[in-house]
């Protein structure tokens, strides 16, 4: 799964550790935990927690979808049209974009 921050930068979920506090969400590369990257900034901690819950839910969905296997994805693409389905899968299943503060 890909994680996209509020500015559009892209991070591989499996290569980062994500933490939050005081309305801010950071990523730390597993290979160098001394570095950190700002993923999202919210006006309240409650909004940050909602964003994190959405991330957890979307990650769970992506793992469930991944478990269906290649054949299910192939069937979905042939049923719904390749370009539209690939775009849907990438934008909604295999990536997560942190919402802007005003989207909550």
Regions found by a protein language model. Name each.
Residues 1-104:
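Eukaryotic intrinsically disordered, low-complexity regulatory linkers and tails enriched in Ser/Thr/Pro
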